[in-house]
Amino acid sequence: QYYYRFGKLLIVDPDTADYVFNFQSKYDVRIVPPKQEGDHVERGLELLKELFLNGYSDRVKQELFPYALILADTIENTFTDQYVNMYTADRYIAFLVNDQMLNRTEKDKEKLSREWNNTFLNYSMDKAGWVVPEKFYLYSETEYAKKENWWIPIEGATEKDTADINIVWERGYPTGNWTYYYDDTWTNKIWGYAVSSSREGYLEKFFEFLFTAPQETINKAIVDHEKLRNAHDVLDQALKDDFGIDYRTMIYEAKD
């Protein structure tokens, strides 16, 4: 039904023809098909719908989804030697739906939904050529790379301090990494926030912010800080216009 509706594949029980999608160890990934016994596949499909598919319009599925979605019992990134919950490639996205995933708590399902959707939106930018409007960005690529823009020193701060994140938000950045650099003498540590140093990084961190921060935190941040609010509103509208989604409601909500 998925194929006839959107002209794309939803692979749950691969045959020989599907091995082009890596149900073997090659191309830096190894995918093991899901178990076919009992209601495992049906539960996997339901998990995919609830945590991911239901958040997107038919237009997005038709225009931006890859050629194939794959359900898997194991996804191993053989390049990094890590097992992952999701893997994106030019022509497919694989989702992990093994017993451990199917038996996650409601709160863990909510976290997984955020992870899957965040990964997909970054995939859409990288693989499908989606471009956020120019006015989303604070600076040109060259300006983002300047240290005075990506480094926010906090005078007198120490490692034990957790400096006010409002300082980062006021600059228009959604997140910052609390770290240090040495002064010109290479003897004294200067603590502060390191923020995105490129346009790509800025967009990635904004997605991370939208899909990991509590909504009340996002609301407070954009109400109090104009630069952050402007970027947020541009991205928010672009997601609605181009994906037909509202990030506030697309994520799976825990039932307990």
For the regions a protein language model found, what residue spans apply to each?
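First exposed extracellular module after export/assembly in secreted or surface-exposed proteins
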Residues: 2-256
